[in-house]
């Protein structure tokens, strides 16, 4: 397995070998909180239903290992907003994690503070996933009224905002 840690929190895990020791093949499967069939699958299904089956544009604030990319379907554009260039380097390196290279190889990654970079985007999104953490804490500047107004201003008419709030303090 390859694991991405920040502080004391796992932010992504990928199985790299089968139980018999052979390398895994095909599309990687997220193993942590974004596992297939979990709550994120329910949210993306509801968001797709709200827009007649396909999400044109999805914004993900926080890249981590890139495991959310494997919830993307053909024809959907998922844009990742990430503040840490080292996280981008790790997620893009298929020797470390294959989520991006296998599931969304052309996905745009916007480097910088998502409050500012998302606000500067001309796009409307059918789904915005706020999944930014510093170790196990949510950066509070991403949860201010001003920041939330900015996210809501970039939602399409049927868009949804998903805020991942699980942490050791809530």
Name each model feature, range by range.
Residues 1-108, 114-118, 137-139, 170:
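Class I S-adenosylmethionine
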Residues 55, 124-126, 158:
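Local beta-strand N-terminus motif with an aromatic residue
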Residues 158-165:
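Conserved beta-strand signature within the Rossmann-like core of class I S-adenosyl-L-methionine
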Residues 58, 128, 161:
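Receiver (REC) domain switch-region micro-motif
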Residues 143-158:
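A short glycine-rich, Lys/Arg-flanked "PGG" loop and its adjoining helix->strand segment in the class I
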Residues 73, 122, 155-156:
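Short conserved AdoMet
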Residues 132-133:
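Conserved NAD(P)H cofactor-binding loop of Rossmann-fold oxidoreductase domains
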Residues 119-129:
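A short acidic, Gly/Pro-enriched loop at the edge of an enzyme's catalytic core
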């Amino acid at each position: 397995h390859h694991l991405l840690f920040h502080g004391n929190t796992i932010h992504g895990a990928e199985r790299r070998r089968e139980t018999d020791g052979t390398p895994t093949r095909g599309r990687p499967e997220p193993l942590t909180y974004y596992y297939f069939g979990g709550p994120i699958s329910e949210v993306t299904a509801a968001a797709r239903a709200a827009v007649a089956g396909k999400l044109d544009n999805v914004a993900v604030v926080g890249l981590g290992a890139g495991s959310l990319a494997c919830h993307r379907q053909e024809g959907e554009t998922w844009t990742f907003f990430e503040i840490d260039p080292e996280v981008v380097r790790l997620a893009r390196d298929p020797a470390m994690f294959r989520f991006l290279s296998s599931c969304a190889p052309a996905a745009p990654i916007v480097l910088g503070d998502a409050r500012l970079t998302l606000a500067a985007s001309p796009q409307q999104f059918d789904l915005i996933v706020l999944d930014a953490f510093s170790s196990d804490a949510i950066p509070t500047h991403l949860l201010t009224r001003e920041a939330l107004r900015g996210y809501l201003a970039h939602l399409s008419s049927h868009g949804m905002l998903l805020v991942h709030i699980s942490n050791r303090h809530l």
